[in-house]
Amino acid sequence: MEEKIQKLAAAVIFSDGEISPDEIQYLEVLAEKMNLDKSNFKRVVQKEIQELIKMDDEEFHNYIKNATSGISDYEIRKSIFNSLMELAIIDGLLDDLETSILGTISEHLEIPLHYFVNNMVYLVKENNVEVTSEFNLSDK
């Protein structure tokens, strides 16, 4: 399970092409939430990001598909997805690429679209996140 969470966190961080210090710092929070070793978790995620840089679109899609497969418990899937949404907005911005990757992850985790949208709207408003996505959640 730890490897799947690391891969998904790497995908979210990588999705907008920018790795912010806030995102890297949030990895420690995420590891703590999931009761995982913080330093190892962060190191592996950063290594995964380097692997993602080398992938084409099809490889990236398969990477997401593999990282989301086999997580049968809905509450665990939801908990992971909630943390990934927080990770996506931790730098104060939400763009098309992050929205798109979260949509793909939610689909593969079988998280309902309404859950994704409602919770993202809440997080965006609660944290005063700047939305630069065509899927402008701040207007919902």
Where is each model-derived feature located?
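Small-residue-enriched hydrophobic alpha-helices in membranes
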Residues: 1-140
